[in-house]
């Protein structure tokens, strides 16, 4: 009965109402998920020091790298599950759920162990100085192993949402974030545990979230759940998961590479070692604010995903078009609001993270520059998610790479040569706006597919 109700809503509910029902929990979930890192940065910047904040920023490339593999499995499996449910193929959806467990185990073991062993040389490579390295090491020694649980919590939270439980997925993230915030405060202030306390708080929250999410798929009433018969390894299913998940994986992986490029640029173009360390901390603050906006946008796009995936699988192309149009419009609004707030109140935003006047002065100027491209980025992210949701992974990968690598890397190589440290900041809006332009061209060129007859459009559905 519950399964029929979820399926009927995806197929027949009015799109604005359906998108609201899916997007609100997804937005809360993604924004709350971003609070893992943001809350750590606020408590560390305010409760430890500005160099501890910079040390935390140095860890981003490693953490983004590890999270990329969770996104590979979670995003890929969730899209496949929603499409298969649209095709009324629940047994195959449950086999996809089971194979995602194997894939998560393998990817996490193969990535966590090397990152832990080579932690110090990696941090040095990523721009750590003698002032920031001890803080970065202390944090990662706890958080790297905990990312094993984060991969399951993120991946299966996405599948939970895609299979018709957006509110429960939201509750999971709220619970986890609340635990993280409370423990952050207790460990850093009353107990005086510093950055190590923040790491322990994050690790505990990750473990609890993973247990809660996985427990859902053992419940008899779940639309898809773990069944012993479904745990048959299938290379076809693994390929289908990775083919779709490769787009967000590439986006996250290039995000890691971008962080490395940015940090190395700060080291190269800072006038003193102290300025370089502060610039890395400033980038951490700017990334935190930008992450909040992007996660808000991504939440709407993720709310769109099961609607688009199901209706694409069910050959209801008019509903696919409507879901995309409403999502893109909503995200453009969020983009502009985030941009406007940063332009009007940059110092207030920066002061949330630090009381250091040199860091506040540097970051206030940098924030106004770096956030300019965010004004239209909601359209680019929504378009990327559309292509990912209907299985067009190559287009989604290309769009992901345009924003974070294809345009940003050349900008980082060229602009700082003429503008110095300011050129590093200007590379961010230049690459964002160029990526938006590419997204406009691609959606116009592919719109005929979504305007075609229901049967013809569905024939383009990628197979396992």
Task: Please state what every model-predicted region is.
Residues 74, 143-161, 169-177, 198-213, ...:
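Short runs within selected transmembrane alpha-helices of multi-pass transporters and secretion channels
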Residues 26, 30, 42, 79, ...:
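Transmembrane alpha-helix boundary and packing residues in multipass membrane permease domains
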Residues 53-113, 150-169, 263, 282-340, ...:
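Small-residue-rich hydrophobic transmembrane alpha-helices
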Residues 16-35, 39, 62-69, 106, ...:
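Residue-level signal for short hydrophobic patches within transmembrane helices
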Residues 35-53, 123-130, 186-193, 253-286, ...:
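Helix-terminus/linker motif at the lipid-water interface of multi-pass membrane proteins
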Residues 21-40, 142, 176, 205-209, ...:
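Transmembrane helical elements of multi-pass membrane transporters/channels
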Residues 31-35, 75-77, 108-116, 151-155, ...:
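Hydrophobic positions within alpha-helical transmembrane segments of bacterial inner-membrane proteins
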Residues 1-23, 81-148, 179, 190-246, ...:
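Short alpha-helical transmembrane segments in multi-pass integral membrane proteins
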């Amino acid at each position: 009965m519950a399964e029929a109700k979820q399926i009927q809503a995806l197929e027949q509910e009015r799109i604005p109402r359906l998108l609201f029902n899916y997007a609100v929990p997804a937005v809360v979930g993604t924004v709350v998920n971003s609070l893992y890192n943001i809350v750590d940065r606020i408590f560390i910047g305010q409760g430890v020091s500005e160099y501890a904040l910079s040390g935390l920023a140095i860890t981003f490339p490693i953490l983004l790298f590890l999270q990329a593999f969770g996104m590979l499995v979670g995003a890929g499996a969730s899209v496949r599950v929603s499409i298969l449910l649209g095709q009324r193929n629940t047994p195959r959806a449950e086999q996809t759920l089971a194979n995602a467990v194997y894939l998560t185990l393998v990817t996490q073991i193969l990535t966590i162990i090397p990152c832990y062993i080579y932690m110090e040389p990696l941090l040095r490579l990523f721009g750590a100085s003698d002032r920031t390295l001890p803080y970065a090491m202390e944090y990662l020694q706890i958080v790297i192993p905990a990312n094993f649980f984060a991969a399951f919590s993120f991946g299966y939270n996405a599948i939970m949402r895609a299979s018709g439980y957006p509110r429960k997925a939201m509750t999971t993230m709220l619970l986890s974030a609340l635990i993280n915030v409370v423990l952050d405060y207790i460990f850093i202030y009353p107990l005086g545990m510093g950055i190590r306390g923040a790491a322990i708080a994050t690790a505990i929250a990750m473990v609890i979230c993973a247990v809660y999410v996985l427990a859902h798929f053992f419940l008899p009433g779940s639309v898809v759940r773990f069944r012993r018969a479904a745990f048959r390894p299938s290379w076809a299913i693994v390929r289908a998961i990775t083919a779709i998940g490769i787009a967000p994986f590439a986006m996250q992986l290039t995000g890691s590479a971008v962080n490395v490029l940015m940090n190395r640029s700060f080291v190269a173009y800072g006038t003193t070692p102290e300025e370089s360390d502060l610039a890395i901390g400033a980038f951490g603050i700017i990334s935190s604010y930008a992450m909040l906006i992007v996660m808000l946008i991504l939440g709407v796009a993720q709310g769109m995903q099961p609607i688009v995936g199901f209706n694409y699988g069910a050959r209801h192309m008019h509903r696919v078009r409507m879901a995309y149009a409403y999502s893109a419009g909503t995200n453009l609004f969020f983009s502009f609001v985030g941009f406007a707030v940063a332009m009007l109140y940059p110092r207030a935003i920066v002061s949330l993270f630090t009381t250091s006047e040199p860091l506040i002065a540097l970051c206030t100027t940098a924030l106004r520059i770096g956030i300019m491209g965010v004004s239209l980025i909601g359209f680019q992210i929504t378009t990327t998610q559309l292509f990912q949701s209907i299985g067009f992974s190559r287009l989604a990968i290309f769009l992901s790479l345009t924003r974070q690598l294809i345009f940003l890397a050349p900008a980082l190589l060229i602009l700082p040569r003429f503008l110095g440290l300011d050129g590093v900041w200007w590379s961010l809006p230049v690459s964002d706006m160029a990526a938006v332009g590419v997204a406009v061209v691609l959606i116009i060129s592919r719109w005929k597919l979504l305007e075609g007859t229901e049967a013809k459009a569905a024939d383009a559905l990628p197979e396992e």
